[in-house]
């Protein structure tokens, strides 16, 4: 059986602006995200293709790493074939029941950690992918009691290695340097 899955969701900035396509690996709450120009199925498909291609160039397979994807019924996830298919096989896409975001509760919890840094209603339009990688790196580096004082980054890299984390744009932040507030992105 499947012991873990990849949760996928969007986090919106200002209405009509850029959004985050967020991914959360269920067993360790490791999160990575891509900055989308808009909340459309085409943008989701384009960024998923880029992630898959990036992994493929390093002889890694998206569908082997993430065989099961769980998301909601948002219109941005309508291109099922583009989400599931990969040159090396396919992932299986499952949708939560309507109005049951609790069925992907792990990513919802990480959304609250992202919102500590990017408050609800704030615009993502001036952010870069590097900013989003930094936000996710800080979220992944928070030590968690549920993981016996380990961080999501530590669990993920123990399982998959640092190369994959780096490919996904995530780096380790030392615990004393983790910032969980909007000042993380003060420039």
Q: Regions from the language model: what does each represent?
A:
Residues 120-187:
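C-terminal domain-tail junction helix/linker
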Residues 29-34, 95, 120:
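Short small-residue beta-strand/loop micro-motif enriched in glycine and branched aliphatics
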Residues 26, 81-92:
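Short, surface-exposed basic-aromatic patches at helix termini and helix-loop junctions that form
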Residues 1-20:
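Mobile-element integrase/transposase regions
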Residues 16-18, 26-31:
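Coil-to-beta-strand transition motifs
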Residues 16, 33-59:
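Active-site beta-loop-alpha junctions of metal-dependent nucleic acid enzymes
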